[in-house]
Curated annotation (Swiss-Prot):
Biological process per Gene Ontology, one example term: glycine decarboxylation via glycine cleavage system
Protein name per the record: Aminomethyltransferase
Keyword Oxidoreductase found: no
GO cellular component, one term: glycine cleavage complex
Molecular-function GO terms, alphabetical: aminomethyltransferase activity; transaminase activity
Family designation: Belongs to the GcvT family.
Source taxonomy: Bacteria, Bacillati, Bacillota, Clostridia, Thermoanaerobacterales
Organism of this sequence: Thermoanaerobacter pseudethanolicus (strain ATCC 33223 / 39E)
Subunit structure: The glycine cleavage system is composed of four proteins: P, T, L and H.
Gene that this polypeptide is encoded by: gcvT
EC number assigned by the record: 2.1.2.10
Stated role: The glycine cleavage system catalyzes the degradation of glycine.
Length: 368
C-alpha cells in the first residue's frame, strides 16, 4: 500500500475499521462496517463517503465557454451560473475520454470534476485540444478534498452544521463559500447514489475535521461512513455508469444509453461526426439491464451468450441489496437487446439463464 496515493483522510480509515484496497492507484476503503449495511444506510438514512480521489480541473479565461463547448457533448449554453451538469468528453471516434461534472461560475470560469483514474489523461487531453483558445487550464486535484453526504437524511444532518439554508441549493446547483462547521466549502446538490445528497469540496487541511464533525452530528440520524463497495452497488442500482465498465475509449455514450447528454444540435464538438454516423447507421451494440433467472451472481467481464454464440459481456453485476435479486448490466449485440429477451450469462463455465429488463433497477429519490 506504500506506493499508492492517499487522501488526507487515510489515517482516519483505521479508526473506523476501513478495509483498504487499491482503486486506480489509490489506497481507499472498500468498506467500513459492511457493504450491505452501508448501502442500506444511504438508502434509508445517510452515508458519508471520502471521494477526495476525484479530480478537479479549473478552466478560466476569455474563451473558457467556447473551449469547453467544443470539448464536451452536452450544451454549455443551457448551463446557468452556479449550476452543474453531467457530460462526456469524447475522442474523435466517439469513444469516451471521461464522464464528468461541469460546475459553472461564469462564462469565464468553470470547475470540472473528473474520475480519479483519468485525471492525468483528461488534463493532457484538454491541453492537447486547447488550440488557439485563450484559456488557462489548471489541475488542482492535489489541493482539494471532497466528501459526499448521501441519503434522505443528508440535508437534515448537514443543516445542523451551517447557517446557509441548504434547501435553497436545488438539484444539480451549487453554492460556494458555504460555512460548514466553520469551514468554507463549495457545496453542490449532486451525487452518485440515486439518493438526495451533497458533495462538499474544501482545501485538504480541513477534510479530517469536517469528516469527524459530520460523523458526530449524523450518528443520531443513522449516518454511517461508507466505502467504495457501497458507492458502487448504489450507483449501479440507480443505473449510473462507471468509467471502465459502462464507458470507455471504446464504448460511446450512445452505446451506453446516454444520448440525452449528447446534444447534436449545439454546433460542433469533438466526436460529433463519429457519434452522428453511429446514430444514423444504428447501434450495433448497446448496454442492457438483466436479471438472473438461474441462481448465480454475474460479475464484470463474464461472457453473455444467445443462440449458442457469444453476444457480449457483463459490465457490472451484483446481488442488489435493495431489490434482493442478482442483476447486471451488459454490453451486447443490439439484435438481442429487446426487453424480455432471454440470454445466458456464463458463470464458472456454466451458461445460466437471465432476462433482459430495464436498466433503471431503482427509482431515484432526488429532491428536485
Amino acid at each position: 500500500m506504500d506506493n499508492l496515493k492517499k487522501t488526507p483522510l487515510f489515517d482516519l480509515y483505521k479508526k473506523y475499521n476501513g478495509k483498504i484496497i487499491d482503486f486506480a492507484g489509490w489506497a481507499l476503503p472498500v468498506q467500513f462496517e459492511s457493504i450491505i449495511s452501508e448501502h442500506e444506510a444511504v438508502r434509508n438514512a445517510a452515508g458519508l463517503f471520502d471521494v477526495s480521489h476525484m479530480g478537479e480541473i479549473t478552466v478560466k479565461g476569455r474563451e473558457a465557454f467556447n473551449f469547453l463547448q467544443n470539448l464536451i457533448t452536452n450544451d454549455l449554453s443551457k448551463l446557468k451560473d452556479n449550476q452543474v451538469f453531467y457530460t462526456f468528453m469524447c475522442n474523435y471516434n466517439g469513444g469516451v475520454v471521461d464522464d464528468l461534472l461541469v460546475y459553472k461560475y461564469s462564462d469565464e470560469h468553470f470547475l470540472l470534476v473528473v474520475n480519479a483514474a483519468n485525471i492525468e489523461k483528461d488534463y493532457k487531453w484538454m491541453k492537447d485540444n486547447k488550440g488557439v483558445y485563450e484559456v488557462e487550464i489548471n489541475n488542482i486535484s492535489d489541493e482539494i478534498s471532497e466528501l459526499a453526504v448521501q441519503g434522505p437524511k443528508a440535508e437534515e444532518i448537514l443543516q445542523k452544521l451551517t447557517y446557509t439554508d441548504l434547501s435553497e441549493i436545488k438539484f444539480f446547483y451549487f453554492k460556494d463559500n458555504v460555512k460548514i462547521a466553520g469551514i468554507e466549502c463549495l457545496v453542490s446538490r449532486t451525487g452518485y447514489t440515486g439518493e438526495d445528497g451533497f458533495e462538499i469540496y474544501m482545501p485538504n487541511k480541513y477534510a479530517v475535521e469536517l469528516w469527524e464533525k459530520i460523523i458526530e452530528v449524523g450518528k443520531e440520524y443513522g449516518l454511517k461512513p461508507a466505502g467504495l463497495g457501497a458507492r458502487d452497488t448504489l450507483r449501479f442500482e440507480a443505473g449510473l455508469p462507471l468509467y471502465g465498465n459502462e464507458l470507455s475509449e471504446e464504448i460511446t455514450p450512445l452505446e451506453a444509453g446516454f444520448e440525452f447528454f449528447v446534444k447534436f444540435d449545439k454546433g460542433n464538438f469533438i466526436g460529433k461526426d463519429a457519434l452522428l454516423k453511429q446514430k444514423e447507421e444504428g447501434l450495433k451494440r448497446k448496454i442492457v439491464g438483466f436479471e438472473m433467472i438461474d441462481n448465480g451472481i454475474p460479475r464484470h467481464g463474464y461472457e453473455v451468450r444467445a443462440d449458442n454464440q457469444k453476444i457480449g459481456y457483463v459490465t457490472t453485476g451484483y446481488f442488489s441489496p435493495t431489490l434482493k435479486k442478482n442483476i447486471g448490466l451488459a454490453l451486447i449485440d443490439s439484435k438481442y437487446a429487446q426487453l424480455g429477451n432471454q440470454i445466458e450469462i456464463v458463470i464458472r463455465n456454466k451458461p445460466l439463464k437471465a432476462l433482459i429488463i430495464s436498466k433503471n433497477f431503482y427509482k431515484k429519490n432526488y429532491k428536485k
